[in-house]
Amino acid sequence: VIVRRILVTGSADGLGRAAADTLLAAGHDVVVHARNRERAKELDALVERGARLVVGDFTDREAVRRIAGELDEAPPLDAVIHNAGVWRGPAVMPVNVIAPYLLTALLRGVGRLVYLSSGSHYGGRPVLDGVDWRGGSAGSYADSKLFVTALAAAVARLRPGVPSNAVDPGWVPTKMGGPGAPDDLELGHRTQEWLAVSDEPAALSTGGYWYHGERREPHAAVHDRAFQDRLLRTLAEETGTAL
């Protein structure tokens, strides 16, 4: 195994935890992330097995910047799996869009990028006017997933040589998905691991929207260059940090 250094955000439970656990078991150098010290205790077992821990609440932009700074002091990451996500409430836009955008802009020399999308993105609206990026009010989960899927495609276009893909893990039985979710949890995290570390040609492709190992056609706005550019301009203005 070629050992890769991989950050998995939001890895205290659910899909992030499963991905971090699997990558660690495969011998990779994994950086796990929790939003606070209390949640970080759930990662003790992975840390004991050699995972490195970063802690920071992704609703706080300064915490995201601090984590990026800490990681930039170490050797570049071979991959980042942008897994952290919330499905309702005021944290939706800060956690699902602003945090992955800032990490993408700030982390230097990352080899591959994997962004967690959702089938919900098909119901998202490609409208940027009036979006509350700071989380003063509840955000639309569907819109947030459309935006992050478009971000993945924009990064693929602007950073040739850096595979950047979005993954729909399906409706899986995590805390977010609920116990009755019909999709396979194992398949839910396997695609993001494969995109992060595999040297198969398909895994090294870029600009894809993936579901259970297959490339699918995303919402039409995802590959609309004008929308991508508007999104990047909006996020750069909002954060003061350009991609």
Residue ranges and their predicted role:
Residues V47-E62:
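Rossmann-fold cofactor-recognition segment
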Residues G85-P90, R112-P160, D168-A181:
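Catalytic loop of short-chain dehydrogenase/reductase
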Residues A12-D13:
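Conserved glycine-rich cofactor-binding loop
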Residues D57, G85, V92-L107, V114, ...:
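Short alpha-helix in the Rossmann-fold core of NAD(P)-dependent oxidoreductases
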Residues A166, P182-R233, E237, T241:
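C-terminal helical subdomain
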Residues A26-E42:
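Conserved glycine-rich Rossmann-like NAD(P)H-binding loop of the short-chain dehydrogenase/reductase
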Residues T9, L77-G85, N96, Y115-S118, ...:
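Rossmann-fold scaffold of SDR-type NAD(P)-dependent oxidoreductases
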Residues E48-G50, E70-H82, V86-A91:
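A glycine-rich helix->loop->beta "capping" turn
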